[in-house]
Amino acid sequence: MARPDGIDAVFAACDAMALGALDAFAASDLMVPRDIGVMGFDDLLAGRFSRPPLTSIGPDPAEAGAALVEAVLGADAEKRRRVPVSLVARASTARM
């Protein structure tokens, strides 16, 4: 598979999808991150051990857990809560 023109990177909705993209690109002889970057969301443990290790956006576990408990217990069900996230930069992306 040739890299589509103008596409430098893929941002997947979750790390599981990003890991699938890593596999697909490897099977297509595209080198990550030389030919295309890959990034996921949720910072799964598996991303640390993929080849190359997956760059991800990771939510703060304590804040995410607290938000989940509040939602399950029905505490102010109409309230939206933002959970802080951070970039976990690994080798699946390169600086442009």
Segments (PLM) and residue ranges:
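Flexible loop/turn connectors
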Residues: 2-96
